């Protein structure tokens, strides 16, 4: 059974909640919602959140000001029974999720990660081994162009895709490995192309799927 249709205001709040989770890693407070939408009182935000909960879009958790959980549509989940696309080697200059890069589908629900995983990327090399991301592992990735300092990102630098920890410092972007034998990649976006393709939201160990 499909979920009930949202009003324009409810859709605006739902989209803001999702965007806030994607960009900060946590749901917004009622005060933050009220400020963003233009409500005079957090109580107005609370009433709209209750409506979203009744319609099956979110779950409200008691005892915390950020107690909002996005719910997965059962029909959307059923439409993705094949699981998450598994991305292998990415050819230079092509979109990371181009059909030719999809080696298979891995039977895992993207909603088990927070935020949701959109695809799995096969890790090549040990540049992130100090934080347990090893050669051959499957990195669960949430597709987004926004990332904060300290997050592990999938980045495209010129024509190469790499997994590193992000640091923005002044005009430069540093992509740090988690391996003492390697040096960071330093990018000046004024003269070099760089794009954030997604953020890491989990790891599936290589011996768990081989």
Swiss-Prot record:
Gene3D superfamilies found in the cross-reference section: Umud Fragment, subunit A, Winged helix-like DNA-binding domain superfamily/Winged helix DNA-binding domain
Keywords assigned: Autocatalytic cleavage, DNA damage, DNA repair, DNA replication, DNA-binding, Hydrolase, Repressor, SOS response, Transcription, Transcription regulation
Gene Ontology BP annotations: DNA repair; DNA replication; negative regulation of DNA-templated transcription; proteolysis; SOS response
DNA-binding region residue numbers: 30-50
Residues carrying the site annotation Cleavage: 92-93
Catalytic activity, as annotated: Hydrolysis of Ala-|-Gly bond in repressor LexA
E.C. code: 3.4.21.88
Claim: Transcription is one of the keywords in the record: yes
GO molecular function annotations of the record: DNA binding; serine-type endopeptidase activity
Catalytic-site annotation from UniProt: 127 (for autocatalytic cleavage activity), 164 (for autocatalytic cleavage activity)
Top-level lineage group: Bacteria
Entry function: Represses a number of genes involved in the response to DNA damage (SOS response), including recA and lexA. In the presence of single-stranded DNA, RecA interacts with LexA causing an autocatalytic cleavage which disrupts the DNA-binding part of LexA, leading to derepression of the SOS regulon and eventually DNA repair.
HAMAP family for the chain: LexA (MF_00015)
Subunit structure of this chain's protein: Homodimer.
Family in the record: Belongs to the peptidase S24 family.
Stated name of the protein: LexA repressor
Gene: lexA
């Amino acid at each position: 059974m499909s979920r009930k249709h949202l009003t324009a205001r409810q859709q605006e709040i739902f989209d803001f909640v999702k965007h806030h989770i994607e960009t900060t890693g946590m749901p917004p407070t009622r005060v933050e919602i009220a400020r963003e939408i233009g409500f005079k009182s957090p109580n107005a935000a609370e009433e709209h959140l209750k409506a979203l909960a009744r319609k099956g879009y979110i779950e409200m958790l008691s005892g915390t000001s950020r107690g909002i959980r996005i719910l997965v549509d059962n029909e959307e989940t059923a439409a993705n029974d094949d699981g998450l696309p598994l991305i292998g080697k990415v050819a230079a200059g092509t979109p990371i999720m181009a059909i030719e890069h999809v080696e298979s589908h891995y039977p895992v629900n993207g909603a088990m990660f927070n935020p949701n995983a959109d695809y799995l990327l096969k890790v090549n090399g040990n540049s992130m081994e100090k934080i347990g991301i090893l050669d051959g592992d499957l990195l669960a990735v949430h597709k987004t162009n926004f990332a904060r300092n300290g997050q592990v990102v999938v980045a495209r630098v010129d024509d190469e895709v790499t997994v590193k920890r992000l640091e923005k410092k002044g005009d430069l972007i540093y992509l740090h490995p988690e391996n003492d034998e390697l040096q960071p990649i330093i990018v000046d976006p004024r003269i070099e192309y760089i794009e954030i393709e997604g953020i890491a939201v989990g790891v599936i160990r290589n011996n768990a799927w081989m």
